[in-house]
Amino acid sequence: MKRALIAFILFPFLGAAQSQLNTSLLFHWMDSTIIGTSLYNNAYNEVWGMVYNNKEFAVIGSTDGTHIFDVTNPSVSTQVAYIPGADQGAAIVHRDYHDLDGYLYIVCDEGSSTLQIVDVSDLPNSFNVVYDSDSILKRAHNIFIDEATAHLYVCSEKKTGIGNNFNALHIYDLSNPALPSHHYTYNDVGHVHDAFVKNDTAFLNCGNEGLRIVDFSMVGPLITTVHNELGSLTSYPDAGYNHSGWSTADGNFYVMADENHGHEMKILDVTDYSNPVVLSTFFSGLNSDESMPHNQIIHENYVYTAHYHDGLYVHDITDPLNPELTAFYDTFDPTHYSSYMGAWGVYPFLPSGNVLVSDMQTGLYVFEIDYNGTTDIKNKKKTSSLLFPNPSNGLLTTHLSTINNLQVYDLSGKLVHVSKSIKNEAIDLTFLSSGFYTIQLEVNKELFHQKLIIE
């Protein structure tokens, strides 16, 4: 049976550019000599951003190590630092980053790795690796620094040696930034995948054990007081592997994602930590059965999501009950949803407003977002309103009174079908072979484009 998946995109032209909405590509980097992993063929992983000496920097991880670019002027971006990983090669899937007060902290979750600390305060002129050892930790999945307290939260920490060498969460004190010291360990769950922390109140993404909200403000190496669990959430719409999340600046709302195909992101009201409430769900709008969010960050009223196979997505959550799509850019060309591929990380906090994205297969991107641009997509509930039904066997109808011109292009960009002056008629595309197509619709001198997958 043929099946059509549709998403509507407003473009000024078709061309050979990636699918995008209100997004301008300012810089793209990838290095074909860097090998991909044996698991997911990803040469790249996390992205982070930094500002020092009035310069903007992008940090991206690879199977080789850590690459730092000066992206102050994106059109002439250059790599200004490279830190080789303690372990390298096809087994290295994850690296993660956070910086504080001139120091960049680096972890890796595979191989014979180390905690790496880099003095980046003199970039772009110089940098200095001040710590590179496995004596504190050998591997970790993610890290987050609570800037208000200078505490480093290490998720799923593995230490060297045998025996009890794993901590679901380990908190370190960064009073000495070049030599973190033990502050507290938390092992109430099997593991913590990721964390968002503000003033030592932590939102912990605990995989299949859901979300935990924990107060660590009264703990320390010389204090007998233990942590205080403020709330949890294990049963909610599209519950799966609770993967990551971010809070709004006022702390009233929290957006989280479950790393499962077909699972949508959730916006939570967390004004009462003891009773977090899911207000709405949303996703890219492309494939309700297969699309999968990875990492998301909230800045002002927008959620920026690295949405794996679908690329970068930006949603306006001014009204948390009705998130609206603002922009997107497809960083991953293939149309399949196999495994874990595509956009990995996103960083929206640079003073310029430019947004950094890392793609597992295609590398580093710097984007400019047009927040005032026109969009014909407001949210996922409206993405199927121009042509329907969806799914479809290729026989489509429209509520538009007139489509002046319809053109269908295959993956190579070849024009394979044209229809003119369609008026409340069925659109028969059942003759097309299974595959990926781009359809251009001209309606009242406006051009719309849509992705069409016929299966």
Model feature map: region roles:
Residues 368-388:
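Residue-level detector of functionally pivotal "anchor" positions at catalytic/ligand-binding pockets or at interdomain
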Residues 17-23, 41, 379-383, 392, ...:
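A short, polar/charged loop/turn motif at coil->beta-strand junctions and beta-hairpin connectors
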Residues 15-17, 447:
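Intrinsic low-complexity/disordered segments
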Residues 11, 275, 322, 388-390:
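Hydrophobic alpha-helix-in-membranes signature
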Residues 6, 381-455:
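C-terminal outer-membrane/trafficking sorting elements
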Residues 17-374:
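Feature marking well-ordered beta-strand scaffolds used for ligand recognition
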Residues 4-13:
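Sec-dependent N-terminal signal peptides
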